[in-house]
């Protein structure tokens, strides 16, 4: 499924008063062009960055249902598939090494699945922690991703960032030039999302 639902609605759900009286809440999410997934890394010589525009792995318009139980947020759609070969970088050598490292021919897609979000008491800023399963080269690991958000009317921005160790996925950092160039085992995954979020009934009124 080329659908990303995992974090987009947290701010709205914690700030809409009627949600407290509902078991579920239907929403319309319009994803903006600035949305981006970035993987950052470094070696002992140079830093590198891989970018993938949101349009490559997220539908522009999504209809979702969210529910809140015991202070946790659950979503009806919770899977994200990231095509590995859609990443771009100005460092072509690093990008080739990345494809080789994650075996992009054998495993062309990275999988991210949201279990749930533990909501904080803050409607904005640090709004909670997302428990997410990340699958790379067929190996799945669970991480806690902190979620930050800002709101301006129906426009929301979400900033989700986490440093992980590639050895968690049984991957070995590349080494070049007889050991003179070594890639660090830590990478930082950063998902930035900008979107408009409205309850379905309000969205239908302004169509």
Annotate the PLM regions.
Residues 1-4:
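Positively charged n-region of N-terminal signal peptides that target proteins for export
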């Amino acid at each position: 499924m080329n659908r990303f639902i995992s974090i987009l609605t947290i701010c709205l759900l914690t700030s809409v008063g009627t949600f407290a009286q509902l078991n579920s809440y239907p929403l319309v999410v319009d994803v903006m062009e600035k949305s981006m997934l970035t993987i950052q890394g470094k070696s002992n010589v140079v830093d590198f960055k891989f970018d993938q525009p949101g349009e490559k792995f997220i539908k522009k318009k999504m209809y979702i249902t969210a529910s809140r139980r015991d202070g946790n947020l659950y979503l009806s759609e919770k899977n994200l598939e990231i095509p590995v070969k859609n990443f771009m970088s100005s460092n072509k050598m690093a990008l080739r090494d990345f494809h080789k490292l994650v075996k992009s021919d054998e495993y062309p897609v990275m999988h991210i699945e949201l279990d749930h979000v533990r909501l904080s008491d803050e409607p904005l800023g640090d709004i909670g922690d997302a428990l997410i399963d990340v699958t790379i080269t067929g190996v799945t690991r669970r991480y806690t991703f902190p979620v930050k958000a800002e709101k301006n009317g129906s426009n929301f921005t979400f900033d989700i960032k986490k440093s992980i160790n590639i050895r968690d996925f049984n991957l070995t950092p590349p080494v070049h030039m007889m050991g003179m160039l070594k890639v660090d085992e830590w990478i930082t995954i950063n998902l930035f999302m900008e979107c408009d979020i409205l309850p379905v009934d309000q969205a239908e009124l302004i169509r």
